[in-house]
Regions:
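N-terminal regions of ATP-driven nucleic-acid and macromolecular assemblies
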Residues: 1-2, 151, 168-171
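Conserved Walker A/P-loop ATP-binding site and its immediately adjacent core
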Residues: 3-54, 88-93, 121, 145-147
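Conserved motor-coupling elements within RecA-like helicase/translocase cores
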Residues: 68-85
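Interdomain motor-coupling "hinge/lid" segment immediately C-terminal to the ATP-binding subdomain
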Residues: 156-170
């Protein structure tokens, strides 16, 4: 479990996210999903980067909007595995009502990790995942190092909130 902090403007978030996803998909024998939070604005770039890495994007990547997708449809989507892009609030609801079983999640990837506070939906998703599952990874990426340096121990709070043990700082 790790938090990677990269310099703003280098496009590192998409590259790191694609690398995490590609590596997790290398062990594709199980049908457990990889949940990607906060990817709404980067979906196109993420698809393109995964395609460049040789991943069959159409086969392994799905997205759902909770308001447009029914509960049974989301349950089937999670059961097929692969990469699921969804909002943190939708993931919270699905974890709480049993649509998404935390023990069946391969891992969670949180983009824009600097936004995670103790009361954020992303933090709640990670807490639910950690409380209900002993397996699986949590990886996070931030492209706003200045937001992690401001305030009192902001980086330490984000690390604690996301339950990660390692921080990687990239230029």
């Amino acid at each position: 479990d790790a938090l990677a902090v990269v310099a703003r403007g280098l496009g590192g978030t998409v590259h790191l996210a694609a690398d995490v996803i590609r590596r997790a998909l290398e062990t594709r024998e199980d049908a457990r999903p990889i949940i990607v939070l906060n990817a709404q604005q980067r979906e196109g770039a993420l698809r393109e980067e995964l395609w460049r890495c040789g991943v069959d994007v159409d086969k392994v990547m799905a997205r759902h909007r909770a308001a447009e997708t029914g509960r049974n449809e989301r349950r089937a989507l999670y059961a097929t595995g692969g990469v699921v892009l969804c909002g943190a609030r939708a993931a919270c609801v699905d974890l709480l009502d049993g649509t998404l079983d935390a023990s069946n999640i391969k891992g969670i990837l949180v983009l824009d990790a600097e936004r995670c506070a103790e009361s954020s939906p992303e933090a709640f998703v990670v807490r639910l995942f950690r409380d209900r599952s002993t397996q699986g990874f949590v990886r996070a990426v931030s492209e706003a190092p200045e937001r992690l340096g401001g305030g009192f121990a902001k980086l330490a709070k984000v690390v604690k909130t996301l339950s990660v043990s390692t921080v990687a700082l990239w230029p």
